[in-house]
């Protein structure tokens, strides 16, 4: 029935700021919803249409299945008809789990594991030669090398790391006459087995034979080995139960030796028990590196974090884990050490010799030190080696159980590649299996572009048998690689952690996965898929969205990108303004129709009636002062030198993955911050030299991370406006008469807040088969404060009423109070006039959070010596909002500061004073400076992808 309907018909949508709107969305079309930031686009696309589609799907499942799924609340809409099953592909980062990678998300790594398990060839780490299976005769010869009189068990591993009760398997063994098993390391009689938990993994081995080695065994050993190998599909364990007394042997009691009819190196004895997909999984105990447990990283106590500021003396607290005011015991220990090695604890740490520093950090080895400890009238003298700061911290970390102390100790650790697996995450057994001379870790470390090229030539390197086995696997892998290439992610590697991806990258990965699934009849809802994408790659992304449509799906995209709007089959413009000024359908139709709607701000920009103007001249900066970063080599950077003129608006451009963030965030920002704030826990990328920091007093990274993680954080508290509002309420006559202090008007502490909801205004009710429900607190009616506090009013408004005001309303309300008004006007200047000043931080988008931070910086007293770094500040912004944002950023520069933006948006780039274009491509083919200069210089450079697209914006 749904398939025959022409439209998804939404009637009476009132979610958030939507004003009872009716809209028809054509099915099986590429539809763009546009409009100002905060106008209600996401409220319509995600909170109404997607939420209802998802809710209907989940409701159709059994109550058992529903308890594992999040059930959406019914959106505030009268009716939606013609709705298909809905899939949302939003901006949220895929996963913070370090085990989640690009390879696991896209399932390419799963196919790689299968490929290596089926056609990979194991090589001996000792000889470098291919290794082969063992025969029973070879196994007998190895066993006969054990000392005579050794007692052994021959074990057949029936179950290895699988869940279940295994009643049938145990019954079969009983019928075959076996009497003893080893279950999870414990020897058990087969008639007296413990009950196995079907939800836990188990190891079960059959004791096939118990043998004492001597010459009279005859064929018993070979027969028992064959029985064991048959039982366990070619694998058997030998366990040494007891060695004869007074016999020296290289073998040990309880040692296990694995025999396999499959793979073994006769020279080194290196063995592979199996070549199955699970040994290539870093999430399985059968494949994960035992040292790092499949993470690929180790965490070490770092000298630079233990003593972050070497300008401080030991006596004054240079050794941070031992406290800024070290205890008497520690000071006496360090004084004794100083007396022994003839150094002072009162001089800056930096002036100590390297030998003294090594002893302090690592200990005195076997050299004993005379320590004197005074306790009142008693003096205790001990002569022993000094353990060292790092070994002491390691011991504490190993033995302490307190989570809080462990978290505190973690502050002094830095991460490094695992020394056992070199960051590949896998056991040696997995890394010795190769295809075309590469192991699976090396293949996962290639960029998508390099991987596609490697697979295109792989067929030439496989024999006929391997090719026959691998044909279908290769097809699945190459298809998925092609989809990733098409969405502009050719620079990523399969081993890249999901948590390090930007919102745009993770969204495009999920988009590529959806195309790979080949579903049809689905409603896809996407949130700005063009974010983080260079103009060059935008065309490929749009073609991908159209391909999704051509599979028979409805593609609904919330988007501001002009090219995407032009390519859409149908456009819905929500507005006209943001917040309470939005929530209406202003215009509908194709791009030419949208241009003609006078009320549509989008239409004005599309038609050229309104534009972002190119500045008539560019700034040259402060007397040729500049920050110079030399020899940057972090990630893919190729020994890069850059010069950033101070007092300018500088844009860093380049295709996705070219090295912009590596250069600006991971190297420049972190290096400058480390210099200005030595105690900060940041690890800059490698570079040779950083000059010009004497010209700045602050460096600020205004990013899109949340301004708070609880409902109590809000724009008013973050910007400091709420502090002044509370101060104002305390000074009111009624407050003074009652003796109220500032804490009375805080919802974070006892006194004035409602204790029933602890100042949240909501009470969480846990449901079993349904999602948790938040209901308005019936004591304070959602106002957060108790009745006495709410009785204090200014101009007829309580403090709770003020928190419910929009920024615009609050500005009018407090226009005569400069301290509050100045904080609020900056929020309005960055285009956030529509948000409520008490709006929960958890409900703000990344772009809104970034602009709240920007507003906070604007409200500070400027020194004119600040360097601001913003990574894609146009994320989530309509072109009209970008126009407002540019005025704010240029205002910061006019105050003498330097603004550095990493940006793809050409309307922003064209207004820059100076541009640094990184590239020319992404990944290994990037990391170089293509061109630097004014927008005109960039546009004139033929090698610059940015310049090619910028040219038409400068006309």
Swiss-Prot record:
Q: GO CC: one term?
A: cytoplasm
User: Does this entry carry the keyword Repeat?
Assistant: yes
**What are its GO biological-process terms?**
nucleotide-excision repair; SOS response
Q: Which domain of life is it from?
A: Bacteria
Gene3D superfamilies xrefs: ABC transporter ATPase domain-like (1.10.8.280), ABC transporter ATPase like domain (1.20.1580.10), ATP-grasp fold, A domain (3.30.1490.20), P-loop containing nucleotide triphosphate hydrolases (3.40.50.300)
The record ties this protein, via InterPro entries, to: ABC_transporter-like_ATP-bd (IPR003439), ABC_transporter-like_CS (IPR017871), ATP_grasp_subdomain_1 (IPR013815), P-loop_NTPase (IPR027417), UvrA (IPR004602), UvrA_DNA-bd (IPR041552), UvrA_inter (IPR041102)
Query: What are the binding positions for ATP in this chain?
Result: 35-42, 654-661
Q: What Gene Ontology molecular-function terms does this entry list?
A: ATP binding; ATP hydrolysis activity; DNA binding; excinuclease ABC activity; zinc ion binding
Describe its partners and assembly state: Forms a heterotetramer with UvrB during the search for lesions.
Its biological purpose: The UvrABC repair system catalyzes the recognition and processing of DNA lesions. UvrA is an ATPase and a DNA-binding protein. A damage recognition complex composed of 2 UvrA and 2 UvrB subunits scans DNA for abnormalities. When the presence of a lesion has been verified by UvrB, the UvrA molecules dissociate.
What family classification does the UniProt entry report for this protein?
Belongs to the ABC transporter superfamily. UvrA family.
In Swiss-Prot or TrEMBL terms, this protein is called UvrABC system protein A
């Amino acid at each position: 029935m749904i398939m025959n309907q022409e439209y998804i018909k939404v009637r009476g949508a009132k979610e958030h700021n939507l004003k009872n709107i009716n809209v028809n969305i054509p099915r099986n079309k590429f539809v763009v919803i546009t409009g100002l930031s905060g106008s209600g686009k996401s409220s319509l696309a995600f909170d109404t249409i997607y939420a209802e589609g998802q809710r209907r799907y989940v409701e159709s499942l059994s109550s058992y299945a529903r308890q594992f799924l999040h059930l959406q609340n019914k959106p505030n809409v009268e009716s939606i008809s013609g709705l298909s099953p809905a899939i949302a592909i939003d901006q949220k980062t895929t996963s913070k789990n370090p085990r989640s990678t690009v390879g696991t998300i896209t399932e390419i790594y799963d196919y790689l594991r299968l490929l290596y398990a089926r056609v990979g060839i194991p090589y001996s780490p000792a000889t470098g030669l291919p290794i082969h299976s063992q025969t029973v005769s070879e196994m007998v010869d190895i066993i006969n090398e054990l000392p005579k009189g050794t007692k052994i068990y021959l074990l057949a591993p029936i179950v290895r790391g699988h869940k279940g009760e295994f009643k049938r398997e145990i019954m079969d063994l009983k019928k075959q006459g076996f009497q003893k098993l080893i279950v999870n390391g414990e020897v058990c009689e087969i008639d007296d087995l413990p009950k196995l938990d079907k939800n836990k993994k188990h190891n079960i081995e059959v004791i096939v034979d118990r043998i004492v080695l001597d010459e009279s065994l005859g064929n018993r050993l070979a027969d028992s080995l064959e029985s064991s190998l048959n039982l366990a599909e070619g694998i058997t364990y030998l366990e040494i139960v007891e060695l004869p007394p007074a016999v020296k042997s290289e073998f040990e009691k309880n040692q296990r030796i694995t025999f396999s009819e499959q793979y073994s190196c006769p020279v080194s004895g290196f063995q592979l028990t199996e070549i199955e997909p699970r040994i290539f999984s870093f999430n399985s105990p059968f494949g994960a590196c035992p040292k790092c447990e499949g993470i690929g990283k180790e965490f070490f106590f770092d000298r630079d974090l233990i003593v972050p500021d070497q300008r401080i003396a030991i006596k004054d607290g240079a050794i941070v884990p031992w406290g800024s005011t070290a205890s008497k015991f520690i000071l006496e220990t360090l004084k004794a050490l100083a007396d022994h090695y003839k150094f002072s604890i009162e001089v800056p740490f930096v002036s100590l010799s390297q030998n003294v520093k090594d002893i302090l950090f690592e200990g005195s080895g076997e050299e004993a030190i005379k320590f004197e400890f005074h306790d009142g009238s008693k003096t205790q003298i001990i002569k022993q080696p000094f353990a060292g700061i790092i070994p002491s911290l390691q011991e504490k970390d190993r033995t302490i159980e307190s989570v809080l102390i462990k978290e505190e100790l973690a502050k002094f650790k830095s991460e490094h590649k695992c020394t056992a697996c070199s960051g590949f995450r896998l056991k040696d057994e997995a890394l010795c299996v190769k295809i075309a001379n590469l192991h699976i870790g090396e293949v996962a470390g290639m960029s998508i572009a390099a991987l596609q090229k490697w697979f295109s030539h792989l067929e030439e390197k496989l024999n006929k048998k391997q090719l026959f086995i691998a044909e279908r696997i290769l097809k699945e892998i190459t298809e998925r690689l092609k989809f990733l290439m098409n969405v502009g992610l050719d620079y990523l590697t399969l081993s890249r952690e999901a948590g390090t991806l930007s919102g745009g990258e993770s969204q495009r990965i999920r988009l590529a996965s959806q195309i790979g699934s080949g579903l049809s009849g689905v409603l896809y809802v996407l949130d700005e898929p063009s974010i983080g994408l260079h103009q060059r790659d935008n065309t490929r992304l749009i073609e991908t969205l159209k391909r999704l449509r051509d599979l028979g799906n409805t593609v609904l995209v919330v988007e501001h990108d002009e090219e995407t709007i032009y390519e859409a089959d149908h456009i819905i413009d929500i507005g006209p303004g943001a917040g309470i000024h939005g929530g209406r359908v202003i215009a509908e139709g194709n791009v030419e129709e949208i241009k003609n709607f006078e009320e549509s701000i989008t239409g004005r920009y599309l038609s050229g009636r309104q534009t972002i103007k190119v500045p008539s001249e560019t700034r040259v900066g402060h007397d040729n002062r500049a920050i110079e970063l030399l020899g940057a080599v972090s990630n893919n950077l190729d020994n890069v030198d850059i010069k950033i003129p101070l007092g300018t608006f500088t844009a860093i451009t380049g295709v996705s993955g070219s090295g912009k963030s590596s250069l600006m965030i991971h190297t420049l920002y972190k290096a400058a911050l480390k210099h200005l704030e030595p105690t900060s826990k940041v690890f800059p990328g490698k570079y040779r030299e950083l000059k010009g920091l004497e010209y700045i007093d602050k460096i600020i990274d205004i990013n899109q991370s949340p301004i708070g993680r609880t409902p109590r954080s809000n724009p008013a508290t973050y910007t400091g406006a709420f502090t002044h509002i509370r101060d104002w309420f305390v000074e009111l006559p009624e407050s003074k008469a009652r003796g109220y202090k500032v804490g009375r008007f805080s919802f974070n502490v006892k006194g004035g807040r409602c204790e029933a909801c602890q100042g949240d205004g909501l009470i969480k009710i846990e449901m079993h088969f349904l999602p948790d429900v938040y209901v308005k607190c019936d004591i304070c009616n959602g106002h957060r404060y108790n009745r006495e506090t709410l009785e204090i009013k200014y101009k007829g408004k309580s403090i709770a009423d003020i928190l419910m005001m929009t920024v615009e309303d609050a500005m009018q309300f407090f226009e005569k109070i400069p301290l509050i008004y100045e904080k609020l006007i900056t929020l309005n200047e960055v285009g956030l006039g529509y948000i409520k000043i008490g709006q929960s931080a958890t409900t703000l988008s990344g772009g809104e959070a970034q602009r709240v931070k920007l507003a906070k910086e604007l409200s500070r007293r400027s020194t004119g010596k600040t360097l601001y770094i913003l990574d894609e500040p146009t994320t989530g912004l309509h072109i009209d909002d970008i126009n407002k944002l540019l005025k704010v950023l240029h205002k910061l520069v006019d105050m003498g500061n330097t603004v550095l933006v990493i940006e793809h948006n050409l309307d922003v780039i064209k207004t820059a004073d100076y541009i640094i274009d990184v590239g020319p491509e992404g990944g290994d083919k990037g990391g170089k400076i293509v061109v630097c200069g004014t927008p005109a210089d960039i546009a004139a450079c033929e090698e610059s992808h940015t310049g090619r697209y910028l040219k038409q914006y400068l006309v």
